[in-house]
From Swiss-Prot:
Lineage of origin: Eukaryota, Viridiplantae, Streptophyta, Embryophyta, Tracheophyta
Top-rank taxon, per record: Eukaryota
CC terms in the record's Gene Ontology section: chloroplast; mitochondrial small ribosomal subunit
Family as reported in the entry's similarity comment: Belongs to the bacterial ribosomal protein bS18 family.
Region Disordered, residue ranges: 1-51
Entry's Gene Ontology molecular function annotations: small ribosomal subunit rRNA binding; structural constituent of ribosome
Location in the cell: Plastid, Chloroplast
Protein name in UniProt: Small ribosomal subunit protein bS18c
Organism, scientific name: Cryptomeria japonica (Japanese cedar)
Main location, first listed in the record: plastid
GO biological process: translation
Residue stretches of biased makeup (Polar residues): 1-13, 35-49
Listed Basic residues bias regions: 14-34
Keyword terms of this UniProt record: Chloroplast, Plastid, Ribonucleoprotein, Ribosomal protein, RNA-binding, rRNA-binding
Self-association and partners: Part of the 30S ribosomal subunit.
Length: 116
């Protein structure tokens, strides 16, 4: 025997009336609690803002697959491309470094894996 679903009450998703949110009430359920973000970090005018980190690439250096001395600074001992956080590079610089490393690997200027 198959169970009959006709006599059961409709679920909250399949109601006959569409559900409309009351716009006068706030969207969040409990506004009496202080929000986590506001209480954890307060900005004080005396506190110094974050320090701009110095780029590891000098202004005259070109990010290019032929510049092996530059590329080797951003590769681990195993031959992997180091993360942007480790390299302390901007996003655009990290993309250019990754592209240069991949081109240099294909042209056999640097090894794919270094077994040290």
């Amino acid at each position: 025997m198959k169970p009959s679903f006709r006599n059961t009450s409709p679920s909250f998703r399949n109601r006959s009336k569409p559900y409309f949110r009351n716009r006068s009430k706030p969207y969040f359920r409990n506004r009496s609690k202080p929000s986590f973000r506001n209480t954890s970090k307060r900005f004080s005018p005396n506190q110094q803002s974050f320090r701009k980190r110095l780029s590891t690439i000098r202004p005259g250096e070109q990010i290019d697959y032929k510049n092996i001395s530059l590329i080797n600074r951003f590769i681990s001992e195993q031959g992997k491309i180091l993360s942007r956080r480790t390299n302390r590079l901007a996003l655009k610089q990290q993309r250019l470094i990754a592209r240069a490393v991949k081109q240099a690997r294909i042209l056999c200027l640097i090894p794919f894996l270094s077994l040290k």
